[in-house]
Amino acid sequence: MKSISGLFLVMLASGAPLHAQLPAGIQFEKGPLNSVTIERAGQRLVIYGGRDPGADQVLITHVRRDLTEFARLAAGNSGKVIAPVSVADFLDYPSAHWTAWWEKRFDYYDQQVTRLPISPLAVAHPVAGGDTLAGPGGLEFRVLETPGYTREGITYLLELEGKKIAFSGDLILAGGRVPDLYSFQDAIPEAKIGGYHGYGGRLGQLVRSLETLAAEKPDLIVPLRGDLITDPQGDIAELITRVRAIYANYLSTNALNWYFKEERLTAAGRLVLGPEAEVELMDYSEHVDLPDWCKHLGTTKLLLADDGAGFVLDCGGPGPLADLRKALAAGLVTRIEGIFVTHTHNDHSAAVVEAAKEFGCPVYAVAEVADVLENPGAWFLPGTSANAVEKVTVLADGEKLLWKNYEFTAHFFPGQMYNHGALLVERSDHTPVFFIGDSFSPSGIDDYCLMNRNLMREDTGFFLCFKKVRRLPEGSWLVNQHIPHLFRFTPARLDLIEQRYRERIELINALTPWDDPNYAIDERWAAFYPYGQTLGSGATGKLELRVWNHSVRDREIRVKLHLPPGVTTARSEAVLTLSAHRHGSMIFPLAIANDAEPGVKVITADLVSDDFDLKQWAEALVKIE
């Protein structure tokens, strides 16, 4: 089992080995976040942050709230904070972001990590690549633009006593690693790929930033987390090799080849793999036209019964809803008797509430989908529609539903996203058809958005989907909601997809210091429920913290809440014990003061276990009215 103590565990630098690498006068303290202090000419400069307030200058490399709060401690009331120019305005007034976020979180497809600052942090000196920053005693820091782990990332370069030292934040960790993979999700404009489909979208920027840093030939790199990097060239080369292997693997079984085609995916691949790289893509599996009894209406499928009734899978917006109205007006169907929702993205669910009301029919879903449909504000997931469905009939995994000349079997099917279902459709005159939402296409698997929670575990995620597809009756077809075809994989093709997926697990495991790669791909392994709630002044409520222990061992996790003014709780600290590969929760009561200031407030939680200490990791929104 891999130890993650090098990244997160509270551990002070022990004696000479770490300090001996640094020039005299640079103090390095290792902890959950590393702290660097330089004192010269009666001035104290701190890099990243620290527990002693009153530093004259505090340099930060990017904007995540664990780092900005660490910097705030060091700056105290008088210290000058130096930060990337692109985020200076945000740091001046973060409440504007959170107020807008109350609405923006719905129908959201930019897919950026949400662990952003809550309280303002005045930036005395915004800096950008190419700038030179004066430090105490005549020291000079050069600034490099090094985006990758974050959009705004920068690196500070210092030459002292014949050594060139780089302070690069979370750009690279010792051993050629990074803290996680989901932080690299982003748009790839060069390939006309948006943020939602941008798996590893900033890995190309990471490679270029690492090459820029390598060209500077630093003697040491001091990251925000973990050990000093004493072999910069070796660790940089190792990290580039690792991310290229992961991205090549991802592209080789990519469902997007069906939609975006070779030109766009090759363009995306070469940004990471190199300008002349050969990009391997999977060719299309067998596919044929839909049967006459299944009509393709955008992302909606309409099933026709022998007596003229219709049954709908998904209804994602005005277009599909208008098509259903046309089908009724034209007599293609005489009535619609039910809607099954495969998953929670708005292009499959936004018009469900209107359709159900207009057609007077029930809505069906598996439990993991149903709660998001009924309580969308309680969740933060990609593309969640704010249009709440009043009543969803929950179908258990494996539950059968007889409708007209059809037999339906509902399945929990956590492929494209964790909150995902599927419907096996059988009728006497046709081979079984498995409507799998958006989880596969004829060219592979739909795992292009890490925020969808594509868990890489034997008991769930795509491995569960592979098992269910293999168990289908021989000759069964698959249907993707976006595709007007039946398709199916040969056993050999499914074996290849699964083999590549297993290989990627090992590659991700080597990329990050976590003891299980799922922490590196699952941003919401610890998340509040409800994510957002509205409470009036003087009201009470509750907040549940849901935690997944992805580790193969038991964990005790200590939790501490950080509450905004006007919000209190009877207990702000608690301990959760979880068995290996289990998830659990704890509930915190909330009380809103009678004189609480109205507006959107943010609650956060620290998470501490024996080998990690994560500050303000999870957040929830409370709108006080």
Predicted regions and their residues:
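Terminal connector regions
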Residues: N594-E625
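Conserved beta-strand hairpin/beta-sheet module of binuclear metal-dependent hydrolase folds
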Residues: Q21-G54, Y156-G169, L173-A174, E278-A329, ...
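Asparagine-centered strand-capping/turn motif at beta-strand->loop junctions
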Residues: V547-S551, I592
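Active-site HxH/HxHxD metal-binding segment of metal-dependent hydrolases
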Residues: I26-K30, G50-T132, P320-A322, A327-L402
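Intrinsically disordered, low-complexity Pro/Gly/Ser/Thr-rich segments with frequent PxxP/GP/PP motifs
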Residues: V567-N594
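Short acidic, flexible loop segments centered on an aromatic residue
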Residues: H550-G566, L607
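Metallo-beta-lactamase
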Residues: R44, T132, E140-Q233, E238, ...
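Low-complexity, acidic Ser/Thr/Pro/Gly-rich terminal tails and inter-domain linkers that flank the onset
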Residues: E506-G536
